[in-house]
From Swiss-Prot:
It is an enzyme of class 3 (hydrolase). It comes from Thermus aquaticus. Its cofactor is Co(2+); Zn(2+); Mg(2+). Metal-dependent exopeptidase. The keyword tRNA-binding does not apply. Binds 2 divalent metal cations per subunit. Can use cobalt, zinc, and possibly also magnesium ions. A divalent metal cation 1 binds at E250, E316, E340, H345. A divalent metal cation 2 binds at E316, E340, H376, D378. Pfam families: Peptidase_M29 (PF02073). Its EC number is 3.4.11.-. Homodimer. The keyword Acetylation does not apply. This is Aminopeptidase T.
Amino acid sequence: MDAFTENLNKLAELAIRVGLNLEEGQEIVATAPIEAVDFVRLLAEKAYENGASLFTVLYGDNLIARKRLALVPEAHLDRAPAWLYEGMAKAFHEGAARLAVSGNDPKALEGLPPERVGRAQQAQSRAYRPTLSAITEFVTNWTIVPFAHPGWAKAVFPGLPEEEAVQRLWQAIFQATRVDQEDPVAAWEAHNRVLHAKVAFLNEKRFHALHFQGPGTDLTVGLAEGHLWQGGATPTKKGRLCNPNLPTEEVFTAPHRERVEGVVRASRPLALSGQLVEGLWARFEGGVAVEVGAEKGEEVLKKLLDTDEGARRLGEVALVPADNPIAKTGLVFFDTLFDENAASHIAFGQAYAENLEGRPSGEEFRRRGGNESMVHVDWMIGSEEVDVDGLLEDGTRVPLMRRGRWVI
């Protein structure tokens, strides 16, 4: 077995054993781009070797998506397969694990009318709501694992031939997910201990807010009442640990939906609905992004923020050190799974119930500051030029990050 095949097998094994922490006899519902079919077959093999009872996969095809967006009447863009997502949510509530294979061409829908892309995305977000709720409430174990899609590889390495670009991207994936180490499972156990130590410190401090300061950024993010920090291996509602993101470098919590003030500028591009949003900035008042703009992709961004009332509020704030393995590559990945783990970030939209004590829902969730929305979109605001302080209720400042690096 050559080194590449060995690492690919390690990644698939890691996704099942560490990412999902698969339970004996558990079903898996997987989603993936059609280009990842060979990798998905390997994942299915590892799943069955580790006790899965059924592996069901749903593929997405960007070429079909482009045809639809280009050809169907405008009114048809309001259609999305709600029946499919209701079925997925039902499977998760009944105990199936969720496995998402990420990795898409970030420019797959480039050149299409932004208003049509945005309209279809709104419909998709509405239909997807039951599935998103099941995921954010951690009703089951879930994970996201990357695949080196050729279109993604060309976006990251535009100057290389496609085959070489794909090889380079796989190398970056193996490094970021620690599968290039002799014992990836042990490496992840050690990594989780580091993340859990940060989580314990932040939860003990009970900060009232966080303050981000850097070029174009002066942002205060109030934290929800009874907020909890999470990071690394996370328990489901039933208490089973899983690692939701492979890779992950973040610790994150829930902002208070009404206590975000100031201005903030993105430090990395955002891949959104098959288009790139660059130079993103926002100004918040009373928790709402009252002004937003971007140098590129502004229309599709604003369409997303019009999805519902909660789309202009924050559902997540995450701290990520600027000297972690992903950031050290010096690459912009044009992929949220990677870029969010290279920089501190915030997210428009839905908050995670796991980030509030007792995992409340409904009115109690809202009363404590949890945000509700049909969308959840992370965007990166941290860098080596950004400092972060924790603010106690009495106004005391506690330095957390200086020049993007932990000081705790």
